[in-house]
């Protein structure tokens, strides 16, 4: 089953790839980037989470090492979107590899085939148990770097990745139905349960 571009990009650039308004004139300080990157996490996980920022080639630069197994991707400067996302370390190799292939302008169908082949061969290690993700995304103008707060124009998302899991096995639908969780990319390396997406709540 080939993945859809919307499904993949929903993870790789947050919940809303296209932001509105001007980009930042300069890159925020590392401490500000770290504070923003861990914001999607439950408060109990923030202090120990590692933070990396990816360059245009999809290569990571560590801003802070992880002390609890969680790794957050900082907002990438230079555009008008605020997007940060956090995953357990076991899922990060897949994130890095997908970002690298996308940065190289690999066609979507070839990317799927490449990831699938690398995962099946064992070259690319995937998690052996479900892993959670925490995301925040929206227009850059809706995030205040000075006090690390987001308005309700920023959307929060929680997902559970279950590589090769199927909707049937989990007893879930494959399309959104009211408030119920549902599965996207069922049966693929990218299979994930969409738990909830909602504007930031204060």
Residue ranges and their predicted role:
Residues 26-202:
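Primary mode marks residue(s) on the alpha4-beta5-alpha5 output face of response regulator receiver
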Residues 20-25:
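Sec/Tat signal peptide C-region and signal peptidase I cleavage site
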Residues 10-19:
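Bacterial N-terminal signal peptides
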Residues 1-11:
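Bacterial N-terminal signal peptides that target proteins for export
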């Amino acid at each position: 089953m080939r993945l859809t571009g919307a499904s993949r990009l929903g993870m790789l650039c947050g919940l809303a790839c296209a932001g509105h308004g001007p980009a930042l004139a300069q890159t925020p300080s590392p401490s500000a980037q770290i504070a923003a990157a861990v914001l999607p996490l439950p408060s109990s996980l923030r202090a120990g989470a590692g933070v990396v920022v990816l360059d245009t080639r999809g290569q990571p630069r560590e801003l802070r090492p992880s002390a609890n197994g969680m790794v957050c991707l900082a907002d990438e400067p230079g555009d008008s979107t605020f997007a940060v996302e956090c995953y357990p370390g076991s899922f990060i190799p897949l994130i890095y590899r997908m970002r690298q292939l996308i940065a190289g302008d690999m066609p979507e169908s070839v990317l799927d085939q490449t990831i699938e082949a690398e995962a099946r061969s064992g070259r690319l290690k995937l998690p052996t148990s479900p892993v959670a993700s925490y995301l925040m995304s929206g227009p850059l103008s809706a995030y205040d770097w000075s006090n690390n707060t987001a308005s309700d124009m920023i959307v929060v998302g929680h997902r559970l990745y279950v590589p090769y899991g199927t909707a049937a096995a989990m007893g879930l639908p494959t399309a959104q139905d009211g408030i119920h969780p549902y599965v996207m990319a069922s049966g693929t390396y990218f299979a994930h349960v969409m738990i909830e997406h909602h504007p930031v709540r204060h």
